From Swiss-Prot:
Species name: Oryctolagus cuniculus (Rabbit)
Location of the region described as Framework-1 in the Swiss-Prot/TrEMBL record: 1-24
Cellular component terms per the entry's GO annotation: immunoglobulin complex
Chain spans, region Complementarity-determining-1: 25-35
Note: Residues 24, 53 and 56 were not positively identified. This chain was obtained from antibody to p-azobenzoate and was isolated from the serum of a single rabbit.
GO BP annotations listed: adaptive immune response
Chain segments carrying region Framework-3: 57-88
Protein's name in the database: Ig kappa chain V region XP-1
Region (Complementarity-determining-3): 89-100
SMART domains attached to this UniProt entry: IG (SM00409), IGv (SM00406)
Pfam family, one: V-set
Complementarity-determining-2: annotated span: 50-56
Keywords from the UniProt entry: Adaptive immunity, Immunity, Immunoglobulin
Lineage: superkingdom: Eukaryota
Amino acid sequence: ADIVMTQTPASVSEPVGGTVTIKCQASQSIFBBLAWYQKPGZPPKGLLYTBYTLASGVSSRFSGGGSGTBFTLTISDLECABAATYYCEXTGVSZBXBKGFGGG
């Protein structure tokens, strides 16, 4: 079955220096096979990969958590440059299921 990724909230506003948490829920367990991406950017900039490993050059202000079906992306000490659309993606999915992206 296809994996559906649902992100909440759809939008969030916090002051500079604050903290934001974005949630991502999978329609079935994906263990910890999740990545987070940031747009703008073509292709989208990878932030965190499986096991919550930070991509090269990404600030440690970004952190990930969760497993199974429920995941979070937390951005602390917010900066103006963090204003963007963030996407979760199920990775490492078996060949008989399509990978799912959150809605951003």
